[in-house]
Every structure is written in structure tokens, then in C-alpha cells.
Amino acid sequence: MKNPFVIILNMSDWTTVVYALLPHPSQPLVLAQRGSGKVSLPNLSYDERVWVGNTRLLKPSLEKLTAASINILHYVALHLDEEMQRMYCVHLLENRDRALFSNDFWQPLEKILEDNDMPSGLHRGLNSWQEEQQSGLTPERRAPWALPGWHARAERWIMDQVMRLERGAVQSIEPIKSWSISCVFKVATETGVLYFKASRELPFFVNEGSVLAYLGKLYPERVPVPLALEPERGWMLLDDFGDPLGRDSAVDQQARMMQDFARLQIDSSQKIEALLAAGCTDRRIESLPTQIDPLFEDELVVSFLAEEERSALQEAAPRLKALTADLLALPIPVALLHGDLHAGNVIRRDDSFLYFDWTDAAISHPFFDMIHIFMEEDDTKKLTLQETYLSAWEEHYAKADVRRAWEVAGTLYGLYHAVSYQKIAHGIEELVQPELNFAYYFLRKLLEGVKKLENN
């Protein structure tokens, strides 16, 4: 089984065809277009592979296509033709102003489904959407922002908070991204730019706004403090804190960032109970052995693996449990983990770094956070980042202990992050599970790590 969301490097070699699914406000009809003697959904194409969550790109194009003011709710169908390098997607839209124009062309979905040029995968998705409309039942794991009416409520809250903060009038609210785990808007006001973020309530996800409010007090130079919070709904409003360092930034800048984060982790190791009380997820190493067997037996996860890979995981299970005990026996303490630490989630500020996007904030072994060092393919860059990061730890702990912990964590990080993705995949609706069903990728990294340890 293959995940359709695997990373494709040559995005420009692809074509993306996007269909607009705009329901009639009161009748079982959808907006349609005529062309070449047939009826179809309004559609457009891009000469690249477009991420389905890129609402910043998609919304203006879809508004022009439909001649309507719309919100993008979610996609209802997705099809990839890898041989032809074409991606097809149907996005469900919500009409913002409810206005109907005399020249609008509305048709029953059955008429649309007569379009044989539309891939069969899209037909299946449209049929499922129609069944959902007829039943009136919404999948319980659907993201809130994929539901009608959510955008209006969020925008009212944003405008209320901007007024409360005395930031002047709201000039625009622009969608940036919307996918299965979060939704982000850019808010332009008379006095500057703000950002709104809504996050899902999922296993191992924190209430990000509440956690940031606490971390921002502990580390005011390193963590942004929300300007406004709605914890019950997972909403927060943040200042625009500038452009991220970026994955293509200079290696020495990234190395300094890793070293700075190591020092934050070392300090956090003295504040574990307070961090847990603030809402960070408790993922201390002791829990890992109990997660191994359920993970390796989870069909949603292992269905992407070959039979020999599944067998290798089962054979490795006792060894992995022993490695966990080895890591526990070393003196490196548990600490604060970001969960997705890379230069794209960091802002450079003079002599300090600001870390954002903390939905995965947790307490566990600090080295598990260094996935982008462990997975770095450039050996020279990898060594630079590794040595700079570890140098901070070696100021406090014996070099032999630090190096052994790094060696073991270089295998077990795959287990930690596979469990993270397993929980996410089970927490979102089946339609969008492929977006984040990447536990199998980290299981392969886990097997690579086991093999490397055996060869050393």
C-alpha cells in the first residue's frame, strides 16, 4: 500500500486540477459549468503540485472561478495519477454572502457524475459527500474549520479581540493554511499584522495557546506569548514575529539554534512538574515499551510496510525494549521537547531565537527532538549540528554518557515519532488520514537504527 502524500521533490513537473464543489443554499444542487458539450464542476489547473491545505493560494483562484465570496471547508475527493504526474482534488466551498446570481448554473450532482473525464476516485468521493448530505451525519473526527459556519464564528472572535487589544480596524483576514490538524489566518490591522491559529484536540497534542502562555513566562526571549486565547476551542491570536530562519539558512545559524535549544532543554529539566502542570504531554521514556507491541500490530500503520519489514519489527521488539532500559539508566534527564524542531519553526532575533508551533510540546528524552539532525543527509552538516548541540550537554554531563545516550536515541527517536503519527492518524477522519499517516516512515528509520547499532 502506498501513501499518496509521500514527499515528491519535483513538484514543478506535476499538474494539479482543482474542482470547486459549491452547494446551492436551499436546493440539492451544486454550481456547475458547461463546456465541450458536457456539464462539469467548475475547475482550474496549476502547473505544479499544489498542497491541498494551501488556502492562501487556492482561495483567490476559487473565488475568481466561482464568482463568489467563499470559504474553503475541506476536500471531499483526491486522486493522484503518478504515471501522468497529475493530481486531482475536489474542494468543498461555503458561500460567504449567500448571494445567488441570475446567471448561476446549478445542477444535481448526478448530472456532474456523468462527466467521464473526471477520475473515478473523484466520483467515489463525490458520492460519499452526497450520502453525507442526505444523511445529515458528519464524521465525528472532522476538523471544526471544515464545518459550515465555523469561519464566521472565528472571524467574529478575531475582530472582537483586535478591538479589545486596541489594534485598530481589521483590514483583512486571509487564510494561510487549513488541513486536518490546524487552521491559520493572517490578520491585517491598522497597526500591523497578527496571526490566528486554531489547532485540533488530539492525543499527544497540547492546548497550544495555554502552553505558550506558560512557556512565554519561563522563556520570554524564546517563546511567543499569545495576545488572546480561547482555550476551549483551541484558538489563539499571535503577533507577527517575522520570517523564520528557514531550512536553507546557513549551517552555522542552524547550529547556534540547536545549541540554544539544548540550553533551554537543560534548564527545563529542572522544571518538569511545572511543565506537566502547564499542559505539556507526559511522554517520559518509561511509557515507550508499552507502546511498541500495539504500534507494530496497528494495521493502519503497518499496511504501508512490506511483509519483511513487519517481521523485522516484531523481531526487533525485545531489543527495543532493552534499549529503552539502557537509555533510562543513563544520567541524561527528561526535558522539554518541541516535537517538530527545525529552522522553519524558529525566528532569529539578534542574539536569541524564538521557537513557535508547539502543538507537540512534551516531556521526554531531549534527544528525541533532534529528528532533523538524525535524518540530515549531508554528512558535514549533520556532524556540525550534532557536535554543536551535544557540546551544550557535555558542559553538564560526562561525554561518554552523552555520546551513548545520543547513539541509543538515534534509534529510538523513530519509535517516539512513529507513536506520535499513529495517534494523529487515529484522531482524524478517514478521508484525510493519508495526510499524516507517516508512522511507517519513522518505523523504517527505526529499523535502520537497529541495523546500525548491530553493525557497530
Language model: regions and residue ranges:
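Juxta-kinase regulatory segment immediately upstream of eukaryotic protein kinase catalytic domains
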Residues: D117-I173
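Acidic, metal-coordinating catalytic segment for phosphate/diphosphate chemistry
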Residues: K2-V17, E132-L137, R141
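ATP-binding pocket architecture of kinase catalytic cores
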Residues: V39-N43, H79-D115, E174-D282
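Active-site activation/catalytic loop segments of kinase-like enzymes and analogous catalytic loops
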Residues: P366-Y397, T411-L431, F438-G449
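Conserved Nudix-box catalytic region and its N-terminal flanking loop in Nudix hydrolases
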Residues: W14-T16, L21-N71, A77-E83
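A cross-family kinase active-site recognition segment
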Residues: D248-A312, V334, A362, Q433-N437
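Active-site acidic catalytic loop and adjacent metal/ATP-binding pocket
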Residues: A32, E174-E190, Y195-F196, K321-M370
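Active-site catalytic-loop/activation-segment of kinase and kinase-like phosphoryl-transfer enzymes
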Residues: Q130-A154, A278-D326
